[in-house]
From Swiss-Prot:
The lineage of its organism: Bacteria, Pseudomonadati, Pseudomonadota, Gammaproteobacteria, Enterobacterales. InterPro entries: GCS_T, GCS_T_bac, GCST_C, GCV_T_N, GcvT/YgfZ/DmdA, GcvT/YgfZ_C, TrmE/GcvT_dom1. It is an enzyme of class 2 (transferase). This is Aminomethyltransferase. It comes from Yersinia enterocolitica serotype O:8 / biotype 1B (strain NCTC 13174 / 8081). The glycine cleavage system is composed of four proteins: P, T, L and H. Its EC number is 2.1.2.10. GO terms for biological process: glycine decarboxylation via glycine cleavage system. It comes from the Bacteria.
Amino acid sequence: MAKQTPLYDQHVACGARMVDFHGWMMPLHYGSQIDEHHIVRQDAGMFDVSHMTIVDLHGARTREFLRYLLANDVAKLTQPGKALYTAMLNASGGVIDDLIVYFLREDYFRLVVNSATREKDLNWIIQHAEPYQVDVTVRDDLALVAVQGPTAQQKVATLLTSEQQQAIAGMKPFFGIQADDLFIATTGYTGEAGYEIALPKERVVEFWQQLLAAGVKPAGLGARDTLRLEAGMNLYGQEMDEGVSPLAANMGWTVAWLPEDRQFIGREALEQQRANGTEQLVGLIMTEKGVLRNELPVHFSDDSGNQHVGVITSGSFSPTLGFSIALARVPAGIGENAVVQIRNREMPVRVTKPGFVRAGKPVAL
């Protein structure tokens, strides 16, 4: 039987269409996915993301442990509260999960991992933490709410005490601060400004109702997916998984190659992949009528006239742009144009970098 977050009854009261999402009953939408998408781009929307897993790591050797566990390097995190995005890899360089890691104290780091990968993530982390004597605590006592959009931070501020407002004043992106019983982070999955707020489960219903009263509208999984796609953000299980290298998923920037003597899980395999070359993740734009869908084939010719085939990993109509966009994994050598097979039609598409909308505005496409 699917699990429920503490906000389940609130979603039902708001008219949500509930669906089973990796074993959790979650809101797909509250009436109109497109309206919810536009609200986040133009005003402020909120998402229940309590199905995600928060993991606290304690111990004197926690930093050393994470430098081995993760492809990005937590040595970069020197200011308490600073966070970074990273992959956790297997020995063959495949992505076990993508996650955010926060540096809170020298002996205290926090991870936020995906819901679909919860069990394998926890098993992997616990297994590798043991030699470092790091305590792994799963924070199932916390709920998580993302408030996103150009007015999100302003609307959240109306619910905070003066002390909490002072604690987060001037906070830059990718930071997290504990302010009383709220852990407030300037992170998100929409390409908009906003917060992801962790708080005790018993407080989250009241907090949700306060956000509603402040004019923040609820948004579901459907809008969350089109927002992250417009922002060019990966979804685990589509853009990457245990058989896909971060180098083939537009995540090369999350791999810290220096210092050369840092050994992290998957490094040897990644170095070989870097030397040999990998597939790449690109953006696709189709302004003609039709919708680019997951798993459709992408055909193109390289400069030598050789034919290649890739595949769409995520595709959808873009509510912000008014036409169809996609992310696709393709062999190296793709130019600016390709063709996607939609039923029995060959549709021309333009190839771009992943990322189509930033802060509510179209990227120069």
